[in-house]
Amino acid sequence: ILDNEKKVFWQHSGLSLDLRIDRVDQLGDGSLALIDYKTGKFTNYKWFDERPDDLQLPLYQIALSTGTDQPVSATLIFQLNAENIGLISPMELSDFGAQIKVSRQAKSFEGGWPALQNYWNKSIHKLVEEFESGLVAVAPTRGATTCQYCDLGPLCRIAESEQSEIPLSEEDI
C-alpha cells in the first residue's frame, strides 16, 4: 500500500476536480494500482459504453496518471458487503491472478490496458467539452433504469422531453 485516501487534482480546459482515491498500491514493477472500496450492493459497472455510466475509476485513472511519473497499470473495485467480498476490474490483470472478477463488458472490448486508458481519456475529454459547451440533453443512457437511481428527480426535465415526443393534434397547431 503506497497511499490511502490519496488526494489528486485534475484539470481539463475550464473544469477542475479535487478527487480522493481510497487506496493506491505500488506493484512489483513500480507501476500503480488504484483501488476504490464499495460497501453497497454489487452493480455491473458500465466502463466501456460510448458515454460511460461509471466514471469514477476512469477519472481516478486519468487524474493519477497526470499527477505522477509512475504509470497506472490497474484500476480495481474492492467490493465489501454482506453478500460479496472481492475485487472487480475492467480488464484482465495478470499481477493479481484469478482472484479478480473481470467486467462482463471487457470481453467485447478490443485492446489491452493502454487502449482502455486511451478510450477513457477520450471519453472524459469529450464529456468535459460537451459540458463546457452547454450541452444539457435529456438523454438517460439506460432509460427508466437510469432514472430509477437518480437523485435529481425534482430538477429533471425528462418529463418535458417525453411530452415533446407526443404527436400534436390539429387543435394544438
PLM features: residue spans?
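RecB-family 4Fe-4S metal-dependent nuclease core
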Residues: 1-173
